Amino acid sequence: VIDGEKWVAGVEPDRLQGWERGLHGDYPSTKPYKALFYAALLMSEQKEIDVLVTGLPVSQYMDVERREALKSRLEGEHQITPKRSVAVKSVVVVPQPAGAYMDVVSSTKDEDLLEIIQGGKTVVIDPGFFSVDWVALEEGEVRYHSSGTSLKAMSVLLQETDRLIQEDHGGAPGIEKIEKAIRAGKAEIFLYGEKSALD
């Protein structure tokens, strides 16, 4: 429940009618973002979170005020359902791709891989819906001048795919249907009762 309204989160975009994903730089201050945040808190099954780590696109992460605003929104007591609240003691904001790097470093059992990524140079690329972000790391430290963000992200690719399918077939399946097929590893979708290739 957000501001007295019931929300759902974690549902495939094509399952919701009349809903569009926000594609703007202030997404972390929106109700859909808060709904996803609350869903994550609920799924944690915890009453208290000592440290919550979240990410921002690299270009937004570079803005200290934006980082601090997100941190202050997420810290504190959150009433996530009428009978459940979760306290978040501390929030750490990182550049989005750095989270994948930290996950590999903390979870890999491959000593050779760990030696390579901790002692060498690594680039982590995060092709998201809103932005494509990349982080360059050297010996585990982020090199901010070699890291960045592009807004020519998955949303742009999906829109162009939708446009090309419409151009070829006279109808567009919609970006949600295309995205769902790609996530499922499918190379085709149904359009007008026939299979249409995504390549």
Question: Model-found features: residue ranges?
Answer:
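Nucleotide/phosphate-binding catalytic cleft detector across ATP-hydrolyzing
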Residues: 1-122, 141-155, 168, 176-199
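Short, glycine/acidic-enriched loop or turn micro-motifs at the edges of active sites
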Residues: 99, 129-130
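Conserved catalytic-loop position in the HRD/HxD motif
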Residues: 124-128
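Short beta-strand scaffold segments in enzyme catalytic cores
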Residues: 132-136
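P-loop NTP-binding/switch modules centered on Walker-like glycine-rich loops
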Residues: 161
